[in-house]
Amino acid sequence: MTRKGIVKKLDTVFSEYIRRKYADKNGIVKCYTCNKKAYWKGEGMQNGHFISRASRALRWDEDNCRPQCYACNCMRYGQNYIFAMNLNEEFGYNKADELLTKSREIVKHSTPELLDKIEYYNEQLKNM
């Protein structure tokens, strides 16, 4: 598998993990920014990032990601202000600033690191 294929696989596994982690026993998950509820799988919910996936330091950071509906994640550009307020409420006052600072770090994940992350999140999914 190419590196691009490995990144795509990790994105897919990580996205499923985030959505299922916050789903209830019936598979219903709530959008982090608008509270809309939908089934975790399919078009209804996505893995929303506070700081864009372009930041390699935060692309697969669990604190940076929460389930978001398509409208908030894509049409409303992630609702970053509301996302930040919710992160600060959940983790403490400075969480959004901490993530913003971390996003400026230069990170290059090795291929073995990416493969390890795929294995880790596949294991997490099996245990859900």
What are these regions (language model features)?
Residues 95-128:
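Short flanking/linker segments adjacent to small metal-binding domains or redox-active Cys/His motifs
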Residues 51-65, 88-102:
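Short microdomains enriched in Cys/His and/or Lys/Arg
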Residues 36, 65-92:
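Short Cys/His-centered divalent metal-binding micro-motifs
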Residues 1-30, 107-112:
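Short, charged surface segments at domain edges that flank catalytic/cofactor-binding sites
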Residues 6, 57, 75:
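Conserved aromatic-histidine-acidic binding/catalytic patches
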Residues 30-64:
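Histidine-centered nuclease catalytic patch
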